Structure formats: C-alpha cells, structure tokens
Amino acid sequence: MTLERDAAAQVAKVLSEALPYIRRFVGKTLVIKYGGNAMESEELKQGFARDIVLMKAVGINPVVVHGGGPQIGDLLKRLSIESHFIDGMRVTDTATMDVVEMVLGGQVNKSIVNLINQHGGSAIGLTGKDAGLIRAKKLKVTRQTPEMTQPEIIDIGHVGEVTGVNTELLNMLVQGDFIPVIAPIGVGPDGESYNINADLVAGKVAEALKAEKLMLLTNIAGLLDKQGEVLTGLTTEQVDGLIADGTIYGGMLPKIRCALEAVQGGVHSAHIVDGRVPNAVLLEIFTDSGVGTLITNRKRH
C-alpha cells in the first residue's frame, strides 16, 4: 500500500507541476521535428505517439515534421542504388528521389500517422506536395578552394530549400482538431519534387505558423559546453557566441542555425531535445527541468 501511495503521490506531483504549463500553452501551436532514436525504438515510438495525443487532448496543437534518412538508406541498399553525400546532404538523382518519396511519403509517414491514431489521436499524413504545402526550389551548393578563382557549382540533384508554406491548410487542419504529420518533400514551380532536410522544413513551418515552440528531437542530451555539460537555456546572442568560439560545430551547426532562424523569425522558443529519453516532448514542455536546451530571443522579454 505504501508503494502504491508513493506512486500516486508522484503522479500527483507531476500533474501539479504540469498544470501551469498546460494553462500557458492551451491553444498554442508547437512544431515538433521527429527523428533519430525516437523513431527507431519501439518503446520511444509508442511514447512519442502518446505524448502527441496528450498534448492535443489538453488543448495544445502539435504539428509533426518527420525525418527518415536511415529508412531511405535501407531501401536504396536493397535496390542496389548507391548513396552519396556532399556536406551531409544526400545527392538525390531521379531514382533516389523516387525512393525518397516512397519511404518518406509512404512507409514512414503512414506508420507515424497510424501509431498516433492507435493512441486515440486524429492524425493526417501529408507531404509538401499536398495542396502546395511546402513550396521549394533547387538548393544551390557551391564549393571553393584557395586555388579557385570562382566557386564551383555542385549539382546534388533534387535537393531543395523551402520558399513558402501553405499555412491556410495547416491552420484548417489544426482548427479541425487534426494532427498534421508532414513528410519533408517539397514541390517546385513546375511540380518537381525536392528532398529537403527535415529540420529545415520544421523550422520554416514553425516560422510560418508563428508557433509558440519549435522542438528538434536529437540523439544527444542537448547543446553541450566545452566541458561536456548541457546548456539548458540560451539566448540567440549566446548561441552566436558559441558558434563563433567553436563550441558549436560540425553536424550540430545546421540544426542550431535552423533553430536560430525560427526564433529570429517569430517563434517564441526553440528546443534541442534529447529524443532518447522516454516522453521527452512532455518532459521538455511540462516540467521545470526539461530534457534539453531552450533557445529564446532576448528581445522578446
């Protein structure tokens, strides 16, 4: 009985701590980029789906943007299509783009939608091609060495960048109590498909919706200082300083720049969240301690 009471008391404590956050975020939109380990572990997948459904149940509006790089790589390998990367971006020729659309728009998207719906949500799967949801153009990549007088233009195929977001469609779905689940495939002016980094799509969607929060699930504990300790709260100015002094570097740079752009573009805060932690989304939103790094714009306070 004592153990049961202790467990009940812990639940009550958690709910009590969550209440002010729930009140604060009722009616607000949160854009969550879902990827990494959180998409691979069955326990974490189930927990993510429950978190999303609970958010909607208490009046918060989640919009999910998902990745799927490992799943794309697996199918390309099975089809004997070689993968090439330049600056961390997948070179996407026509054959690869077909696979990207099959995996992201089909297999991955529908599995996430199905999981959320199994837990009582009303999720709808979309790609950026649906109603021109994610408008895009070809990403221009250049490279220059000291020996070159002019930068070299590198063609990485159907890789794009976001030029616009159909917020009317997303707002209609959110107001209808649906949970949009977006595959990061954009559509060009002539109907061509583009493979776009999911972090970038999530950031642009959050910015276009003027979302309360952008949450990027990762496979790390958050932004780390040079001693390896998690930096729990930063302003955009502090993040700029950490980039300048080399604390933030390598593969984290594109993710952090995406978060910075979103906050500077009107999103109230961006979060780098440890997706390896069960119920990471709820812990970051509804508890005092959180499970990652919060980035805000000083000018908004």
UniProtKB/Swiss-Prot annotation:
Biological pathway: Amino-acid biosynthesis; L-arginine biosynthesis; N(2)-acetyl-L-ornithine from L-glutamate: step 2/4
Name of this chain's protein: Acetylglutamate kinase
Annotated substrate binding lies at 68-69, 90, 195
GO terms (BP aspect): arginine biosynthetic process via ornithine; L-arginine biosynthetic process
Q: Which gene encodes it?
A: argB
- What domain of life does the native source organism fall in? Bacteria
Q: Which CDD domains match?
A: AAK_NAGK-C
Positions marked as site (Transition state stabilizer): 33, 255
What functional role does this protein have?
Answer: Catalyzes the ATP-dependent phosphorylation of N-acetyl-L-glutamate.
Q: Which InterPro entries match?
A: AceGlu_kinase-like_sf, AcgluKinase_fam, ArgB, Asp/Glu/Uridylate_kinase, NAGK-C
Q: Which GO terms describe its molecular function?
A: acetylglutamate kinase activity; ATP binding
In Pfam terms, one family for this protein is AA_kinase
Family, as annotated: Belongs to the acetylglutamate kinase family. ArgB subfamily.
- Could you tell me which PANTHER family the record lists for this protein? N-ACETYLGLUTAMATE SYNTHASE, N-ACETYLGLUTAMATE SYNTHASE, MITOCHONDRIAL
**SUPFAM superfamilies hit by this protein:** Carbamate kinase-like
